[in-house]
Amino acid sequence: MSIIFHEGSKTFHLFNEEISYIICVLSNGHIGNLYFGKKIHDREGFSYLIESKQRPMTACVYEGNRKYSLEHLKLEYPVYGTSDYRNPAVEILQENGSRISEFKYISHEITDGKPELAGLPATYVEEPEEAQTLCLRLKDEVTGIVLELLYSIFSGKGILARSARFINEGIAPVHLLNAMSLSLDLPDSDYVWMQFSGVWARERHIIERKLEQGIQAVGSIRGNSSHEHNPFIVLRRPSTTETSGEVMGFSLIYSGNHRMQAEVDTHNTTRVTTGINPQNFDWKLDCGESFQTPEAVVVFSNQGLNGMSQTFHKLYQKRLVRGYWRDRPRPVLNNNWEATYFDFTEDRLVEIAAKAKECGVELFVLDDGWFGKRSNDYTGLGDWVANKERLPFGIKGLADRIEEMGMKFGLWFEPEMVNKDSDLYRAHPDWILHAPQRASCHGRNQYVLDFSRKEVVDCIYDMMYKILSESKISYIKWDMNRSITECYSVALPADRQGEVFHRYILGVYDLYERLTTAFPQILFESCASGGGRFDPGMLYYAPQGWISDDTDAAERVRIQYGTSMCYPISSMGSHVSVVPNHQLNRITSLHTRANVAYFGTFGYELDLNKLTDEEIAEVKAQIIFMKEYRELIQFGNFYRLKSPFDGNETVWMTVSEDKRKALVFWYRERNVVNAEFTRVRLQGLDPDLIYKNEYNGTENYGDELMNLGLLTTDVTAGEPTNEDLPCTDYESRIYVLTAE
């Protein structure tokens, strides 16, 4: 790993064992991008990569020079309005109404390690030798705005982290209207665009299309990263598969409004930009003030989609997630929500918890309904004090009873929301986001607290701190059950209303940081009606997230498959729920529900007292299995083998670091009569080790399993005679492979 500056050619070469990233100072002082991809040899200069030719109908920078136009150069952080007609990375409104900027190189600094981003989540290092950072310092002489571009390259992996910082060293305030975290110009457009989109209960489905001339973009203006479009996109070559070929993944470490975009120009070059969504963004930068963008991470792999995903998994597991729970297997939990909804008493909860303890559950979680006058979703939000009618001895009394059983206790909060029927709202009706003289929309009968205001965040912190400090609480589920509307703060002046969305999410991060600092051993799980704010920004504070409110096993296969493109298995909240499923009314077998839920944090979303003795025996066996293999599942090397978006079967697997153990998950959506035999080539095994398949007792070398494949499909002849695999839909199996 190294960052080299060639003074003569003013070229920077950032490289490690896998990638090279080459940029240079162009003749006009702008920064140009020359190359990003597989590692290449270093040399004094790469000027031959600067493509500057005369073209018709082009605006040119220099008098008398018809070859130098920004429109046809690959730029590193393009500006608005000076001969580049593609979308810019930055747009600044000045006092005179101009939006023209010209940032030119003035200096740079190369340091070991990686700096923190004040008030924002970001990847980190524990030792300086893990990364090097380049800070390019540019300046717009007219406004006095200084732009710092940060690049951190990590040792050993194809990872580059980028962000930008603006400092107003001028004599007048300006307004940032657009400030991307990353802009990357690529020399061609021969890519397939992949996005991870959906809706509530159907998040992160894979959508693909070939890049064409024009703009392809996804984003959010909901105040959260959204169910609809995750802040993650992929560009892969058309021939790239899960196991081979070039691919780039772009991930934004941010939980608010975002935009992920690829623009192909008329000469088929591609510009990728990621960052805060410029819609409804307007940040006033007074003299002496600075603004830091969120961090974007780009990963390059020439080992296919699995190679890219594994790089993201390891980075986010080890250098984004922090604290006590980073490297610890997650406890098996039982959440009461789908078992009781709002209809519970303390004794009923203890009854559910007792059965869970009997089955081997380690953590009991009390969900919504424990506070204020919360008997439905119309009342109580914001009043974070125990409802003594339901919990006569408060949260402490219930937590003590759960602890006495030998289990840990967890609790649900929705800190950012309030009901109008609450003491908090009655005391502070101006604490919600709302536009004066206009009606306010509600979602789930609730309103959004103005977390851009410190006094609001302080109040919620004080209430949560009191509960957490007085009771034995080991886990917090932090929910957000609506998106933001009427994004206006009565505490800010008119010329700062464009800051509210970003200030809001900074307030959320501040509350998370204060709570995780005060209670470092509490396991936080983020949630937003399921997967509405499942993003890297949340992982910095909460090591795991509830990826979807849909707990149906068949739907979860698709959701978990898409989610795994970027996010590690240890981050995915996944539970076994009742049937018929509460979201789809679908019935799937208990073993399939568990087989799918294993590949996440694992738990139960039901009242185990309502299961039969046979089902209880199965649950006990499931929990024993999960406890034995959860470290392998949550922290092993994960491979996708067959996609649910491509056919009737889904296969994925996880392999231990020493390659001596592997679990293979096989799932069949629909039963097929008289089907062909199918084999799946496994990945990541040691070719020279012999693996015993615990399902059928067969033994095979790793190279056999990776080249000949594992036989997964039994043949159904039309009669229910196959004892190994029931002749039903939604069937699954786990293969345990152990090296002899």
Question: For the regions a protein language model found, what residue spans apply to each?
Answer:
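Glycine-rich, aromatic-flanked loop segments that form ligand/cofactor-binding clefts
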Residues: S69-L117, E242-N257, Q261, V299-Y324, ...
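Carbohydrate-binding surface patches
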Residues: I233, E242, P644-P687
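Aromatic-lined carbohydrate-binding/catalytic grooves of carbohydrate-active enzymes
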Residues: W325-Y461, Y475
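Conserved, mostly hydrophobic/aromatic
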Residues: E18, A164, G288, N334, ...
